[in-house]
Structure formats: structure tokens, C-alpha cells
């Protein structure tokens, strides 16, 4: 009987694999995934490039620190609102259409930014950010085109793109704005985003899902046609394990997210760093991100269960919190950064993998959109909460908050029996 079951299981896997290969072919599928990585790397490079010059551009136009805070909050709110809508769009119209929308929105974003010669125009340039979701778009392509067993490792490699974006974007923004003028990086971002749009149009196929999943998608979209629906979000959260894992995803990284939002001020006031030294520190983070995602996350994902890795990332986060509470110099922070980047990368990769496997394939885009909204949510509420923590209790408060929250989550994960399974129908 066990032999028959094994054969049946093997036959089912071969049939599923055959459907996937029938859609595009193995070599073509790998090529499309590599193109998705390239689009994500370029998109993040341009994003970090504009983030580097934005404070200087805002200051040159006469915007004070309070106004700049409003500008950042608007960007966060737009990304927060657009994340889920973008995911639903990807489910209904395909990953290719979603990536084209993201890259085209990026082009409009940089065009408006290049024309921002006044404060109102600078605020107006934030509007296209509602559809600028290159990373979730690439995640959608990879989710559609990888088997569940390979998904965590494939999504983890996107962290390499993040590292490339931090290093290349920060460096390009600084060099171009210093040598050629503050608006030159926006011209580069405009041209680069247009090229990214063409790459998505030419190299990403119109249908990235296996044929069986494509029929499910058509059924799903006919059932719920609107791009934004609270009912649909609640429906996704009711799948086994989804709400529990999503809560861990939000709260485990929230304290460190607050710290990173305040980091520009902390680096000046607490560490006493100059702008150039802060840039070096960001590059160090980028290198760590690439090493961890390229050499560690994928290998651990292939040898350990996802629940084990989720618990590990939360436990390491708790240790990072203790280190942050005790740190006094930038060298302490450089040491803490190693487990910090590991926990951050592992948590993001594993939770995305678990959540996309826990919902039907016709809803993976919406689920990725919800996941992508976590960071903008932190950016929206972060300046207020982070500012109060820093002003009233100092840098150590971020560490103690990180320690307490993640110890609580670790105990919760040890005691709870979260059902983790592939729910594809």
C-alpha cells in the first residue's frame, strides 16, 4: 500500500511539474526568474538613489524637517494603500502587467521629481508611489514559477537584489548629485525605469502561472472583481495559519523598523557620524544583506523546516534587542548588525514563503501585497512613535522593546501549533 501511495504521490508531483514545464519549459522558466531578479535589482537601485538625494532636494526647495516628515509620511501612506491593490491587480491581470504598471509608475515618479522646482510639485511627485511595487512584482513572478519546496530559497535570493540596490543606489545618488547636480539622479532614474518597463514587456511572459492555476485565477477573479476589498483581506486571513504568521511578521520587525526610521538622527546624535560615514555604514549593511541572503538563507531553508527557521529568526531578534539596549558605540552596532541582518532577512523570506503557500495560488499576489504593506505601515506610524521613544527614553528603549516583543513572540511560537500546509485549492 505504501508503495502504491508513493507512486501516486510521485505521479502527482510529476504531473504538476509537467504542467509547469508545459507552460514555459524549464530553461525558459529559469530565464524569466533571472529577469525578475534583474528588474528588482534595478528598481531598488533607483529607489535608494532617490532616497539618498531627497533630503537635500527638499532642503534646497526650502522644506523644513517637519515638512520633510510629512513628505515621508505621504510616501508611506501611498505605499501602504497601494500594496494590497497592486497585489490584487497582479492576481487579476498577471505578474507581467503588474511589473509593467510598477515600472511605468516609477518612470512618472522620476519625471515629476525631475520637474519639482517647488514644494507643491515635490509633494505631487509622490503620487505615483501608490503603484511602485517592484519587489512584490518580482516576488509574484517567482511565486508563480517555483514549486512550493523551492520557494523560500528563490524568494531569499531577492535579498541579493536588495543588497545591490542599497550599495549601488546610495553610491550613485551621492556621486551623481555631487558631481553633476541634484536633479541628475532623477534623470537617471527616469531613463532606468523606462528601460525596466521595456524589459518587463519583452522578457516577462503574459502568463506566469501553470495552466491549472490560471483556470483557478479566472474563477477567482470572476468571483471578486474589485481591486480593493476588506472582505477579501479577511477571507485570506481566515486560511489556517495565515493570521498567526502575519501577526508574527508585523510585530517581530516593528521595533527595529522604528529604530531604522530614526537612524539618520541616531547616527548623527548618538554615534556622531558624518554623512559620508553614514553612507559607508549603509554600504556595510548592503554587503551583509547580500552575504546572508546569498550564502545562508537558501541553505538553511533547504535543510530546516519553515517553523524552525521562523522561531530561530524571532529568537535571534530578541538577542539583537538585548545587544541594542547595551550598545554604546558605532562599532558595537556593526557587530550587532550581523545577527540583525540575518534575523531580518530570514523573517521576511520565511513568512512570505509560508503565507503564499497557505493561500490558493489565485490569491498569492494579494497575499504578497498585504505582506508588502507591512513596511509602509511602519514608515507611516514610525516617525511619531520612534520620535517619542528616542526623545523620552533614548536609544536603548528600541533595544528593550525589541527584546520584550520578540521574547513574547518566541514563547507564543513554542506553545502554539500553527498549521503550516500547502493550501492550493
Describe the role of every protein-language-model region.
Residues 52-66, 261-277:
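Short amphipathic helix-loop junctions that connect adjacent transmembrane helices
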Residues 13-30, 206-247:
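Juxtamembrane intracellular "pre-TM" segments in multi-pass secondary transporters
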Residues 83-94, 177, 292-305, 390:
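Helix-to-loop junctions at the C-terminal end of transmembrane segments
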Residues 81-117:
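Conserved MFS/SLC helix-loop-helix module at the cytosolic interface between two early adjacent transmembrane helices
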Amino acid at each position: 500500500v505504501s508503495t502504491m501511495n508513493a507512486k501516486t504521490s510521485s505521479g502527482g508531483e510529476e504531473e504538476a511539474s509537467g504542467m509547469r514545464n508545459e507552460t514555459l519549459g524549464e530553461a525558459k522558466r529559469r530565464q524569466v526568474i533571472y529577469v525578475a531578479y534583474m528588474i528588482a535589482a534595478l528598481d531598488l537601485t533607483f529607489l535608494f538613489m532617490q532616497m539618498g538625494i531627497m533630503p537635500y532636494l527638499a532642503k534646497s526647495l526650502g522644506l523644513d524637517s517637519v515638512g520633510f516628515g510629512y513628505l515621508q509620511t505621504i510616501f508611506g501612506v501611498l505605499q501602504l494603500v497601494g500594496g494590497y491593490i497592486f497585489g490584487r491587480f497582479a492576481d487579476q491581470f498577471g505578474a507581467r502587467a503588474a511589473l509593467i504598471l510598477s515600472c511605468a509608475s516609477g518612470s512618472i515618479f522620476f519625471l515629476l521629481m525631475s520637474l519639482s522646482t517647488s514644494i507643491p510639485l515635490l509633494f505631487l511627485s509622490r503620487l505615483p508611489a501608490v503603484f511602485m511595487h517592484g519587489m512584490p512584482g518580482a516576488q509574484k513572478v517567482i511565486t508563480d514559477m517555483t514549486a512550493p519546496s523551492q520557494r523560500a530559497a528563490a524568494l531569499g535570493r531577492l535579498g541579493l537584489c536588495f543588497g545591490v540596490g542599497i550599495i549601488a543606489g546610495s553610491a550613485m545618488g551621492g556621486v551623481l548629485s555631487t558631481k553633476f547636480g541634484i536633479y541628475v539622479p532623477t534623470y537617471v532614474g527616469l531613463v532606468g525605469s523606462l528601460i525596466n518597463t521595456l524589459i518587463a514587456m519583452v522578457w516577462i511572459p503574459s502568463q506566469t502561472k501553470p495552466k491549472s492555476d490560471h483556470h483557478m485565477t479566472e474563477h477567482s477573479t470572476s468571483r471578486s472583481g474589485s481591486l480593493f476589498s476588506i472582505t477579501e483581506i479577511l477571507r485570506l486571513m481566515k486560511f489556517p495559519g495565515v493570521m498567526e504568521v502575519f501577526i508574527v511578521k508585523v510585530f517581530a520587525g516593528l521595533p527595529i523598523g522604528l529604530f531604522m526610521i530614526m537612524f539618520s538622527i541616531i547616527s548623527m546624535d548618538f554615534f556622531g557620524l558624518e554623512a559620508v560615514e553614514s553612507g559607508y555604514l549603509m554600504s556595510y549593511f548592503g554587503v551583509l544583506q547580500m552575504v546572508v541572503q546569498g550564502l545562508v538563507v537558501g541553505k538553511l531553508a533547504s535543510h530546516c523546516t519553515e517553523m524552525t527557521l521562523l522561531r530561530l529568526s524571532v529568537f535571534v531578534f530578541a538577542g539583537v534587542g538585548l545587544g541594542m539596549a547595551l550598545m554604546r558605540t558605532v562599532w558595537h552596532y556593526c557587530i550587532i548588525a550581523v545577527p540583525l541582518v540575518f534575523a531580518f532577512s530570514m523573517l521576511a523570506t520565511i513568512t512570505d514563503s509560508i503565507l503564499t503557500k497557505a493561500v490558493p495560488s489565485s490569491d498569492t499576489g494579494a497575499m504578497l501585497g498585504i505582506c508588502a504593506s507591512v513596511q509602509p505601515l511602519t514608515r507611516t506610524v514610525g516617525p511619531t512613535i520612534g520620535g517619542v521613544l528616542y526623545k523620552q527614553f533614548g536609544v536603548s528603549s528600541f533595544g528593550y522593546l525589541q527584546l520584550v516583543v520578540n521574547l513574547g513572540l518566541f514563547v507564543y511560537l513554542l506553545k502554539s501549533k500553527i498549521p503550516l500546509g500547502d493550501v492550493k485549492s
